[in-house]
């Protein structure tokens, strides 16, 4: 809890499977998963969605932004599903765009932004619902080394606020910026 952790391993080692289990997107056959003091085994989709919404934020290599929505609309989207009014969700989304240094880009579409800007919008979207844990799947994989360092600096700042961050990465220099690294081989932690 409160750490920034890298998960590394070769292709097929189980990194994505682990992230999907932690994100309550896939079930698991053995072991125990406790989130916020509650066991996660055997959750139905509705209960899993509730836990995801309340405790988890996701950041993906491909950003997963909605192309026809502006930066502020993309960031505000999780709040829409929480039934927050448009005025309030836009104000909150702008607060998070400021946090990631993109307040001037609020009305731009994803195709008008660089990869680093898109990733920062994705991070703001992950943060807007105030998760306890951020799950990041190759968050720097599509970025150049300078932008990767900027994104990692931002993630470290977020981590200092007490948010646990789990990063799947192939990049050793990214893992070196984390508190610890978990190595996976054939689905096992080594």
Where does each model-flagged region fall?
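ABC family nucleotide-binding domain
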Residues: 1-184
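Conserved switch/coupling elements of ABC/ABC-like ATPase nucleotide-binding domains
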Residues: 186-190
